[in-house]
Regions:
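Bacterial lipoprotein signal-peptidase II cleavage site
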Residues: 19-26
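Residue-level detector of transmembrane insertion/anchoring sites
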Residues: 9-11, 65
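Bacterial N-terminal signal peptides that target proteins for export
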Residues: 1-8
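C-terminal motif of bacterial Sec signal peptides marking the signal peptidase cleavage site
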Residues: 14-17
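Generic short amphipathic/hydrophobic targeting helices enriched at N-termini
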Residues: 8-9, 210
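Surface-exposed, well-ordered secondary-structure segments
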Residues: 26-256
Length: 256
């Protein structure tokens, strides 16, 4: 009987050892790979290429569309009452205009500007340029903003397959970026805008995925915050000041 107990104990120990030998770590999750388009200088052709990747323009049509894209250029008449102020509504582009976009910022607001921000700082008049005439955009009190996607005209979380931005006056490499996030909050990658390469000073970066998986993007504009006493590195300052123009993104589809 004693020997049988010893044999049983030995068998259990052997089984436990065998089981521990078979424990393996789970493979790291696979991050989907983006198709990335970048250009600086004469950006028009590359922007059109990106638009074509996403499909036809859906404008401000309310409701989820089967295919296509949305685009914000800041120039519509509906935004005029908010021009050159620091209180542009964060939800304007899903309430006033049904484009499926809502913005947040750690700063104090947003500014839609028709003066190249020269009313903020006179040196900006020659610093920034627009892509689509004539308004440009930036957060107030921060160089960072997030864009969240919703079904056009509805407060329903949505996902998009692609996102691109026109930037103005990128002076430093890898400081002006888009970071895309999935529905679970995981990062889908950080994508840098190229440095300006001509007097116009425009840069573009666009990303697309095979499927609609982007729930949010974080946009970082250079290294500094616009201000009356803050000059760009090209005007004797210490910060790379950047603003944005057109936002182009795939049709937001309801998140499941």
């Amino acid at each position: 009987m004693h020997s049988m107990r010893l044999m049983a104990v030995a068998a259990i120990v052997a089984l436990a050892a065998c089981s521990s030998d078979k424990v393996t770590s789970l493979p790291a999750p696979v991050v989907p790979q983006a198709t990335v388009l970048t250009v600086s200088g004469n950006i028009a052709a590359k922007v059109d290429e990106f638009r074509n990747l996403l499909g036809p323009a859906n404008g401000g049509t309310a409701g989820e569309q089967t295919t296509g894209r949305r685009e914000i250029n800041w120039d519509g008449a509906g935004a005029n009452p908010f021009d050159n102020k620091n209180d542009f509504p964060a939800g304007f582009f899903n309430s006033n205009v049904k484009a499926g976009a809502v913005f947040t910022t750690p700063g104090t607001g947003f500014r839609n500007d028709s003066t190249d921000f020269s009313e903020v700082n006179a040196t900006y008049a020659t610093q920034f340029n627009f892509f689509s005439a004539n308004k440009i955009f930036a957060p107030v009190g921060s160089n960072q903003l997030d864009q969240l996607f919703q079904v056009a005209g509805q407060p329903t979380p949505a996902l998009t397959r692609g996102f691109g931005i026109v930037f103005s006056d990128v002076d430093l490499a890898d400081k002006t970026t888009i970071e895309a996030f999935a529905q679970d909050g995981s990062s889908l990658g950080v994508f840098s805008a190229p440095v300006r390469s001509d007097a116009g000073g425009l840069s573009f970066v666009g990303i697309t995925f095979d499927n609609a998986i982007i729930a949010r993007v974080r946009i970082t504009l250079g290294t500094g915050v616009l201000g009356a006493n803050v000059n760009d590195v090209s005007s004797g300052g210490t910060s790379d000041l950047v603003v944005l123009d057109n936002l182009i993104y795939g049709e937001p589809h309801k998140a499941l």
